[in-house]
A protein has these predicted regions:
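Cysteine-nucleophile active-site neighborhood
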Residues: 153-233
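Internal gly/pro-rich beta-alpha loop/helix module
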Residues: 1-95
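Short acidic, glycine/serine/threonine-rich loops at helix termini
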Residues: 13-19, 41-47, 116-118, 158, ...
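Residue-level signal for short, function-critical loop segments
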Residues: 8, 107-110, 211
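C-terminal and late-domain segments of enzyme folds
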Residues: 70, 97-99, 111-123, 128, ...
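Phosphate-binding active sites in nucleotide-utilizing proteins
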Residues: 99-164, 168-175
Length: 258
């Protein structure tokens, strides 16, 4: 164990107290960074504000300057030199595969929550990824399937609802049998309508027979499981899926069964 870098320290006394505790434990302190509001990333109801909506230049510069002054960089570099090599066994190698399908990925200010591993897995399986914007583009790109990830569509409901040509393109693609996978905010976009925090309701794509409404408090959090009732692109009947919920919205089916 090489040591620690203290952060969010509020005062000289705070730093002295923590350093004393670390000394008693025999833990080297490589640096001590003071609390500074300029270093913080702005937050929203689901967590951090997406980088597409902010300019992090000032915060990064503040962090850089603080590290230069408050961290023993020479000791940190020497510590890095003494580190043992990490074992690479078990790491999967990615080999080039023939591109077998063109997959559209919704990516803009409203939809940006994607695990890089998910996109890499698609490419490793032979997908050619094509990014598009449900906010700005008039229609889907020339693709074989579409992936709508999460994001903050509730912050852009007016623009999403006004882009009727994109909605028409998605509905037409669905009618022609194109596979469409939507999760989180993407699923909200696929419903009939979404009501924002102020109670305003906006028509959406309408492929999912349900409506969504934003709430002021957290509605769902935790792990869930699902059982396939019909065969689909994710599995066969009775297959089980595991997932995670973290929602400030509620969904109400408009048809039964859902």
């Amino acid at each position: 164990f090489g040591g620690v870098i203290l952060n969010r320290l509020g005062s000289d006394n705070h730093e002295h107290m923590i350093r004393s505790a670390m000394k008693k434990l025999g833990i080297p302190v490589l640096g001590a960074i003071r609390r500074d509001e300029r270093m913080q990333s702005p937050e929203r109801h689901l967590g951090l504000t997406p980088v597409t909506e902010i300019d992090p230049t000032e915060a990064i510069a503040t962090i850089r300057d603080a590290v230069k002054v408050m961290v023993n960089l020479d000791a940190l570099v020497e510590l890095g030199k003494s580190a043992v090599d990490l074992p690479a066994e078990g790491m999967e190698s990615v080999t080039a595969v023939e591109k077998r399908a063109r997959i559209g990925i919704a990516m803009d200010e409203a939809f940006s929550f994607y695990y890089p591993a998910s996109l890499a897995a698609l490419e490793a399986a032979g997908a050619e990824l094509h990014y598009f914007s449900p906010l700005q583009d008039a229609a889907l790109p020339d693709v074989d399937g579409v992936f709508f990830g999460g994001g903050f569509p509730e912050m852009f409901l007016s623009q999403l609802s006004a882009n009727t040509s994109m909605q028409d393109s998605i509905r037409q693609a669905s009618e022609q049998g194109m596979p469409i996978y939507a999760e989180c905010g993407g699923l909200m976009y696929m419903t009939e309508a979404v009501t924002d925090f102020e109670g305003h309701t906006y028509p959406m794509v309408g492929l999912v027979p349900a409506t969504c409404e934003m709430q002021q408090t957290l509605q769902r959090v935790g792990y869930v499981s699902a059982t396939m009732l019909e065969p689909n692109i994710l599995g066969s009947v009775k297959d089980h899926l595991r997932g995670h919920e973290f929602h400030f919205s509620t969904m109400t089916p408009t048809q039964s069964p859902f």
